[in-house]
């Protein structure tokens, strides 16, 4: 089992979004993630939460974004109950037998995410 955590200031995300617009979002989010976030009452908080979630996942993997896993190798959407769910889009980037769980929260100033990598089989990812 591995964990990763990330925290992001909402103001930082808001500045980048105001400056670069959709181009900023397209750097690290899939189209479904963008649509989900922009439909929320507080899009900046949702965008920051997704950013933190993606950072937490790569920290749990121990690779970082430049270590073979890219921003769009996976997406963070919601299930029917509203819980965030990680979907692996490029499974070749991820070790076999891994399941990733994610939790996201935010307040007026920041968003935080924690990722937990679990193994379906014995051994390491």
Curated annotation (Swiss-Prot):
Q: Name one GO molecular function term.
A: holo-[acyl-carrier-protein] synthase activity
Record's GO cellular component, any one? cytoplasm
Q: Which locations, inside or outside the cell, does it occupy?
A: Cytoplasm
Give the main localization category.
cytoplasm
Q: Does the keyword Metal-binding apply?
A: yes
Biological process according to GO? fatty acid biosynthetic process
Question: Which keywords, in A-to-Z order, does the entry hold?
Answer: Cytoplasm, Fatty acid biosynthesis, Fatty acid metabolism, Lipid biosynthesis, Lipid metabolism, Magnesium, Metal-binding, Transferase
**EC number(s) of the enzyme?**
2.7.8.7
**According to its UniProt record, which protein family does this protein belong to?**
Belongs to the P-Pant transferase superfamily. AcpS family.
Q: What does this protein do?
A: Transfers the 4'-phosphopantetheine moiety from coenzyme A to a Ser of acyl-carrier-protein.
Protein name in UniProt: Holo-[acyl-carrier-protein] synthase
